[in-house]
Design a protein with these regions (language model features):
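Catalytic-core segments of class I nucleotidyltransferases/pyrophosphorylases
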Residues: 1-56
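Tandem repeat scaffolds
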Residues: 80, 86, 95, 145-151
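Glycine-rich hexapeptide-repeat left-handed beta-helix
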Residues: 100-179
Length: 179
């Protein structure tokens, strides 16, 4: 009734005014932190704020020749290979596996992700159960959907989105959605 199929709609400018007119829009007083995370950079920014609030309040159980640059949150089940650098502003979910000499910063890595040796991830959101090959470079504001595969030696330009379960074996040199 309020949202027409097949076209973009602005909730704030189109739907909310109609709901107000009909007396169907209600509010809730909330004392906590709230932010709009409709874009990748917004989601990453709120993660920075949350990680800053955790600084010094958690322990990382990371062993060996691994560099941690706080703030970082690593699930206890995450494994990180020798020579890798995690952070600042990195989140590693459950059962994330990071290979040797990988570098991850300003990124959120969801559960079950496998990141191979010598990969560089900076400012990305990587969905669940993604496989990242060796020597991969993922640039800022990239979003990788669940179950995607990024092959060895692939570079993704800033702002690339990869749809879920998509396999990518060639560089993506411009900001676009890979379907």
């Amino acid at each position: 009734k309020y949202i027409q199929p097949g076209r973009k709609v602005s909730l704030e400018r189109e739907v909310f005014p109609k709901l107000v007119e009909e007396g169907k829009l209600f509010g809730y007083v909330f004392d906590g932190l709230w932010t709009d995370i409709g874009k990748a950079e917004d989601y990453l920014e709120i993660n920075k704020i949350l990680l800053d609030s955790l600084r010094g309040r958690h322990e990382n159980v990371i062993k060996g020749d691994v560099k941690i640059k706080e703030p970082v949150f690593c699930d206890l089940s995450a494994t990180i290979g020798e020579g890798s650098t995690i952070g600042p502003y990195a989140v590693l979910g459950k059962n994330v596996s990071v290979g040797r000499n990988a570098h991850i910063k300003n990124s959120v890595i969801f559960s079950g992700v496998s990141i191979s040796d010598d990969s560089l991830i900076n400012g990305a959101i990587i969905g669940e159960n993604v496989v990242v090959g060796k020597r991969v470079k993922i640039s800022s504001n990239c979003v990788i959907g669940d179950y995607a595969v990024i092959g060895d030696n692939v570079s993704l330009a800033e702002g690339v989105s990869i749809c879920p379960a998509k396999e990518v074996f060639h560089d993506v040199s411009e900001s676009k959605c890979v379907i």
